[in-house]
Amino acid sequence: MTKHFTQIRDLGYQAAWDVLRRAKEMKDSRHRSTLLEGKSAIMLFEKASTRTRVSFETAVHQLGGKTIFMTPAESQLGRSEPLRDTARVLSRYNDLMIVRTFGQEKIDELVEYGSIPVINALTDEGHPCQVMSDMLTIYERTPDLEKVRVAWVGDGNNMANSWIEAAIFFKFELFMAFPEGYEPDRNLLALAMQAGAKIFLTHDPAMAVDGAHYVNTDVWASMGQEEEQKKREKAFAGFCVDDALMAKAAPDARFMHCLPAHRGEEVTEDVFESPASIVWDQAENRLHMQKALIEWVMEG
């Protein structure tokens, strides 16, 4: 049966932990393999990217494979050809599909009509590869995840949704602060709470950060929301992670950001460049986690 990674929930409890530990092993050993020798990965990217593209291309190369990168300008993706036809054709040529797009429904359609593993490299609804990589960044420092308190400050966006899913399996405490009207998916929250996730919501950033070991944020206007920038700047006033907010966290708290960051908006320059910032470790860990995820889907 073909395996896919379209959201963190696809893993299940045991596989989530197996992949996390495997990613750490791969990082510690600077892992290379021939898993993808003679194989190719098609990368369909409707959204521009630096870290996602380079980390995935490097991951595939380090596992012995080759990549083919395509944007909408270079394909029929989103044009006259139905996506289901694209899925069928690309499955005949390739062994793995890595997709960065807007709607989650496009990932689901590629899964339904394709015959090769599909990895969600980002949608508007989730960013599972990034959050699994962030879990590796935390796990390296605090292996007992049940004793960890993570704070999320900002938008109830795709990153927030994937953090909620991660809380289901890794059992850390997740305190989340959003402006009114910018909360995450309610159905996902209900699902997570029913599964026993320890998630607490507030509209007060200081309350969310109080005692946190890891303080997370993201841009206020994601790709495709540029026309809302001014409106969001007003709504998110008071949600900037600055020295005063970090002072409310645990004494050894770390700052996290998936990048790219808008310094002076969701985070100050001082916090971003401080010793507490672990954003570059997060960026590096994309490579190691994505190798582990590729291995997981390819081994069936």
From Swiss-Prot:
Localization per Swiss-Prot or TrEMBL: Cytoplasm
Involved pathway(s): Amino-acid biosynthesis; L-arginine biosynthesis; L-arginine from L-ornithine and carbamoyl phosphate: step 1/3
Keyword Zinc: no
Keywords: Amino-acid biosynthesis, Arginine biosynthesis, Cytoplasm, Transferase
Signal peptide: none
Organism: Oleidesulfovibrio alaskensis (strain ATCC BAA-1058 / DSM 17464 / G20) (Desulfovibrio alaskensis)
Catalytic activity entry: carbamoyl phosphate + L-ornithine = L-citrulline + phosphate + H(+)
Family to which this protein belongs: Belongs to the aspartate/ornithine carbamoyltransferase superfamily. OTCase family.
GO MF annotations in UniProt: amino acid binding; ornithine carbamoyltransferase activity
Entries under HAMAP family matching the protein: OTCase
Taxonomic superkingdom: Bacteria
Function summary: Reversibly catalyzes the transfer of the carbamoyl group from carbamoyl phosphate (CP) to the N(epsilon) atom of ornithine (ORN) to produce L-citrulline.
E.C. number: 2.1.3.3
Gene Ontology biological-process entries: arginine biosynthetic process via ornithine; citrulline biosynthetic process; L-arginine biosynthetic process
Binding site for L-ornithine: 158, 218, 222-223
UniProt protein name: Ornithine carbamoyltransferase
GO cellular component entries: cytoplasm
Residues at which carbamoyl phosphate binds: 49-52, 76, 100, 127-130, 258-259, 286
